[in-house]
């Protein structure tokens, strides 16, 4: 009698858990249908409602609990099959800063970067569009700097990027971003549902960094990393190849799984011996600099509080602005550390 009762309770608990899981899955599916791209705006309202009504009808009309569960699950599978068929095109009415993909050509230790971005800004939205071809000697690549910037005054979320420094004072910034189209506005939820494509900005620091410090009023912190020249070259080449891949195989941006930080870490984990733990890739990327410090990736012997205080480059960037020596002048805190 006791065993039978336990089995009944287990069956009820299992059924409740199954329905809770299905509720979560169908909530996701409803949002996926809602956020999909439609030719007619009315479809965004009607299709999710129809989807929910179909589910309700199945729950009412299918009598046996197991069959009801199976029927509702099959509907979810149909949504998944539709979802898989949605692929990025690499074609769109993109905003000028993300309209042109950079790509590399390797010739031994020399790499030519085509379409390197070097916009000259007068305001956030007023700029001269410039794409350049530049050649770099990978043997002269010496270090990697880590950038983290905050756009809303909050510490939890941030944008992260890297900059690769050569022994002749040149720097190439690499920033993974949304490939926004004209009229687009970023929303956290939309970023979960294949609404944006991924883009690699490969550019001059006077563009990639200066636009954030001087024209978008973001707080930018710049850290020197402990990455060796050998690993810096491997990492730089891997980023360039990643950017090149997007020409033939566009990717979707994803708020949680394919954003500025997770993509950056994807390259780091592919190339460098030290791997970034899974949870640190996704949770509160505004603290990525602290995670890098804790993992011994940042150079210097200061406490993190001291290092972070010195790393803010906004005042130096505003002062340097149009100066051709912009990259050196935003790094005077590195000179202080060496004294």
Predicted regions and their residues:
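Activation targets extended, charge/polar-rich intrinsically disordered C-terminal tails
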Residues: 7-58, 240-339
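Structural signal for the C-terminal ends of transmembrane alpha-helices
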Residues: 58-65
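Internal/C-terminal transmembrane anchor helices
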Residues: 65-88
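Juxtamembrane/interfacial segments around transmembrane helices
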Residues: 68-74, 97-102, 116-133
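Alpha-helical transmembrane signal-anchor/signal-peptide segments
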Residues: 88-107
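Juxtamembrane extramembrane loops of integral membrane proteins
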Residues: 109, 114-116
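Glycine-rich catalytic cores of cysteine/serine-nucleophile enzymes that process amide/ester linkages
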Residues: 111, 122-220
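Soluble catalytic domains of enzymes that build or remodel membrane lipids, polysaccharides, and related
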Residues: 187, 193-270, 277
């Amino acid at each position: 009698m006791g065993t039978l009762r336990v089995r009944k309770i287990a069956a009820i608990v299992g059924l409740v858990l199954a329905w809770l899981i299905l509720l979560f899955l169908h909530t996701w599916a409803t949002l996926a249908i809602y956020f999909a791209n439609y030719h007619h705006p009315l479809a965004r309202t009607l299709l999710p409602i129809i989807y929910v009504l179909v589910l309700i009808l199945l729950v009412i009309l299918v009598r046996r609990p197991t069959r009801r569960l199976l029927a509702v699950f099959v509907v979810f599978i149909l949504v998944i099959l539709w979802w898989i068929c949605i692929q990025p095109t690499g074609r769109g009415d993109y905003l000028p800063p993300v309209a042109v993909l950079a790509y590399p050509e390797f010739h031994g230790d020399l790499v030519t970067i085509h379409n390197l971005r070097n916009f000259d800004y007068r305001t956030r939205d007023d700029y001269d569009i410039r794409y350049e071809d530049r050649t770099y000697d990978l043997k002269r690549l010496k270090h990697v700097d880590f950038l983290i910037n905050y756009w809303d005054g909050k510490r939890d979320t941030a944008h992260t990027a890297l900059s690769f420094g050569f022994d002749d004072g040149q720097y190439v910034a690499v920033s993974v971003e949304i490939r926004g189209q004209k009229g687009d506005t970023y929303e956290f939820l939309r970023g979960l549902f294949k609404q944006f494509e991924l883009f690699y900005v490969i550019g001059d620091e006077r563009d990639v960094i200066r636009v954030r410090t001087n024209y978008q009023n973001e707080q930018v912190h710049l850290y020197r990393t402990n990455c060796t020249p050998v690993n810096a070259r491997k990492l730089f080449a891997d980023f360039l190849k990643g950017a090149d891949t997007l020409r033939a195989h566009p990717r979707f941006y994803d708020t949680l799984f394919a954003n500025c930080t997770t993509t950056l870490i994807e390259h780091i984990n592919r190339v460098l011996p030290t791997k970034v733990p899974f949870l640190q890739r996704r949770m509160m990327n505004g603290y990525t600099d602290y995670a890098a410090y804790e993992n011994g990736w940042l150079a210097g012997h200061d406490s993190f509080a001291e290092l972070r205080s010195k790393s803010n480059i906004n005042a130096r960037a505003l002062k340097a602005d149009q100066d051709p020596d912009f990259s050196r002048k935003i790094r005077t805190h590195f000179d202080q550390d060496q004294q």
